[in-house]
Design a protein with these regions (language model features):
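Structural marker of alpha-solenoid helical repeat scaffolds
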Residues: 28, 62, 96, 129-130
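Canonical positions in the second alpha-helix
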Residues: 58-59, 92-93, 126-127
């Protein structure tokens, strides 16, 4: 008598273990990039900047195009007086979204902290232009 494979109790146990394993790996999925950003913001608001930095780093690792992750990192780097790293983070934000006026302002502030007044003024000028355009658009939508 031949016993079919699907009726074999050992086969059924192995299959059950594989299915449970697949289900459990789905339950243990990594957080999304946005979830890491939200976590980073929460930690920043609590003054826990080391944890915030860790969360923002995970956000950009998970999604290198995450604007908020790069922007949050820039702020943390400024607090840590790591101005070159802050400059890089804000430039990454701007590269992904050239209209991100807060990133232009923050880049200007970083340049100011670095003593690069000409670069700071260029960034502040771009910030003001973008902010004025955004405010103009928002005012038109209100009326």
């Amino acid at each position: 008598l031949s016993v079919s494979l699907s009726m074999n109790p050992l086969y059924q146990k192995c299959l059950a273990i594989v299915i449970i394993g697949l289900i459990l790996t789905q339950c243990g999925k990594k957080k999304s990039s946005q979830a890491y950003v939200q976590e980073g913001i929460k930690y920043s608001n609590q003054g826990n900047y080391d944890k915030a930095k860790e969360s923002f780093l995970k956000a950009v690792e998970e999604d290198p195009k995450n604007l908020a992750g790069h922007y949050g990192l820039g702020g943390i780097y400024n607090l840590e007086k790591q101005y070159i790293a802050a400059e890089k983070s804000f430039k990454s934000t701007i590269q992904l979204d050239p209209t991100h006026y807060n990133a232009w302002y923050s880049l200007g502030y970083t340049y100011e902290l670095m003593g690069k007044t000409k670069d700071a003024e260029i960034s502040y000028t771009k910030y003001r232009r973008l902010k004025e355009k955004m405010d103009s658009i928002m005012n038109k939508e209100k009326h």
